[in-house]
């Protein structure tokens, strides 16, 4: 059960969804500039996750008292991407109240990100501190975008197409696994050795 939930946060699923979200953001009230802004914020979150993974895998850096090794990538991506998926799919053509990010679709996306984090803990993939860190980083990406740019809206004529495209990508990508972790474990020792970094 928990593995099935955890798969919703795999990069093989969330990154294709993010690409579709960016495409629809360019056609929404947000526009291309704001779509690029969300993409950069997501990339920054991913870079932070990647940095902790490389430091741990290659250099052994960790915070032992709180059992923290790396930021959970599944949880971070899920908490950043699923809120945008839900907002675009469920809020199309609906005028937000004073551009407030406090909406049911946004809450559903954040809750799903938290659930995926819980699944990672039960799967023994991460500790609670790693999942909390992932949720905070991912949620910060989602909420910061909404606070700064408001809730994006797609023309009501495209609402079914938005939901359909996101559903199709989800169905095609679900259950697949990106080889990112394997690449990190392979190259991190080389990078740490190259820069002579010692834990």
Specify the residue positions occupied by each region the protein language model found:
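Short, strongly hydrophobic alpha-helical membrane anchors
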Residues: 1-5, 193-199
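Hydrophobic alpha-helical bundle signature of multipass membrane enzymes
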Residues: 1-70, 75-118, 143, 151, ...
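Short, aromatic-rich membrane-interface segments at the entry and exit
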Residues: 32-36, 127-131, 156-157, 181
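Interfacial helix-loop-helix junctions of multi-pass membrane proteins
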Residues: 53-70, 114-142, 180-195
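Membrane-embedded alpha-helical modules
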Residues: 138, 145-156
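Hydrophobic alpha-helical transmembrane segments in multi-pass integral membrane proteins
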Residues: 149, 171-182
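Internal/C-terminal transmembrane anchor helices
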Residues: 157-175
